[in-house]
Amino acid sequence: MPLPDTLAMMRQLISVPSVSSVSPDIDMGNLKVIELLASWLQELNFTVDILPLKNSPEKANLVATLGRGQGGLVLSGHTDTVPFDENLWNYNPLTLTEADNRLYGMGTSDMKGFFALAISAARKFSKNDMSEPLLIVATADEESTMHGARELAASGRLQARRVLIGEPTGLRPVHMHKGMMMESVHLHGCSGHSSDPSLGNNAMEGMHSIIG
């Protein structure tokens, strides 16, 4: 089966809804998107692994590898989108539409369009004997729980030299990305007496020092 061109790939990806949400009534799987990517990447001689998420058989990550050895370059993105209300769109969100020199559709920018571009760029390497691999990685649930990325990170299977993430950044390459880290601090005081306050330790005062 011949590989579709970039716009045709984008059109097919956008036509498949893959909303992820913490609300079960609107949450969807991403397997159909993963299977599309897998079929195209196999045409380019990538070795493709589809990795179902634990307790979510309708969702999966994908790791596609071209070449051999250690290191290499990862092109990474997510296959899910945020929820959408079709009534708020000027165009059908599940149909790729070109208007005013722009492409409209659910996921054109964030971020199904990235996979069409990455696969198109990989065509020129499909018959190369590369000493370091090119990997294309697709994850699930980035827009909700990050379960896809969490499971992939926990597996420890990605040890590339470089990673490029195709999230939209206003057409300006950036070398960092925001994240989130949560920590908890516990302080325990000890009782004292007004006759000798030095015997005590006030946890409230200690927390004031930490926060301030």
Label every PLM stretch briefly.
Residues M1-Y104, K127-M130:
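Acidic/His- and Gly-rich active-site-bordering loop/insert found
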Residues H78, H177, H193-S194:
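Histidine-centered active-site/metal-ligand motif
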Residues F84-A99, A160, H175-H186:
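Acidic-glycine-rich active-site phosphate/pyrophosphate-binding loop
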Residues N101-L117, H193:
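Glycine/serine-rich anion-binding loops at beta->alpha junctions
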Residues M111-M182:
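Acidic/histidine-rich catalytic neighborhood of metal-dependent amide-processing enzymes
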Residues S194-G212:
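Acidic-enriched catalytic cores of C-N bond-cleaving enzymes acting on peptides and small amides
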